[in-house]
């Protein structure tokens, strides 16, 4: 049974819960699709060795594992990881997804593939149980891991994303196209390369904060600047990343869906699917936060995570 916990803003979750309880008594079995296949989740894929940072803690509880979103990297969570170690005493592991950060590039970019990558690194580090926390694309990866390998995940946090196709107003296709059009001259200072890339992106990506986020992927190799994310593969698999794999069996552990109150990525339309796959979930929204909840409202984000981790 899903419960609702108010955290600054409810966004109608409790109203939906009351409606669902009434509706399920009068029309049992009609709310959710029960005949879903899992073929997409079983295809073989090559596992890659993910780059990671491990922050040591003194508490023996399950470590916290942080998964970034599209165009992000483990460096996005440096401040968050250190704060979580201080607040919880737990070890914290941050990962670079395939085709991102310092992790290898690969031709496949699907959630089953990224789930396999995460499972492999957990096995290599002898982590048999963890608190899995993922933002956006990382949230969908975390959900996939939990649904495929529930014994690995003691509890789950999905930050501003649901187990449903991502809303069509996402700007990711435009970001990819803009990044692919950026032209870099050879042998120029980093400051110049960054300024020129920002100018070229600005015609399509109007928000300066998003441009600065994309520019964290600018790296220099052999005297030439380039994007470290694998734009070609991400572009080819973008629909896979916007969708979510099909599952029938729910995850039996506790889950927190933590959304930004100013973001459309967890809406009331997603509540039925959240309850179907994650029957022991809470949905909370942080007032004043957009899609990048951890950056917009870091203090509130940390409090929500710590309260959830310590609620066992």
From Swiss-Prot:
Phosphorylated. It is an enzyme of class 3 (hydrolase). The keyword Zinc-finger does not apply. GO terms for molecular function: carboxylic ester hydrolase activity; lipase activity. Residues 62-297 form the AB hydrolase-1 domain. Belongs to the AB hydrolase superfamily. PANTHER family: PROTEIN ABHD11. This is sn-1-specific diacylglycerol lipase ABHD11. It comes from Xenopus laevis (African clawed frog).
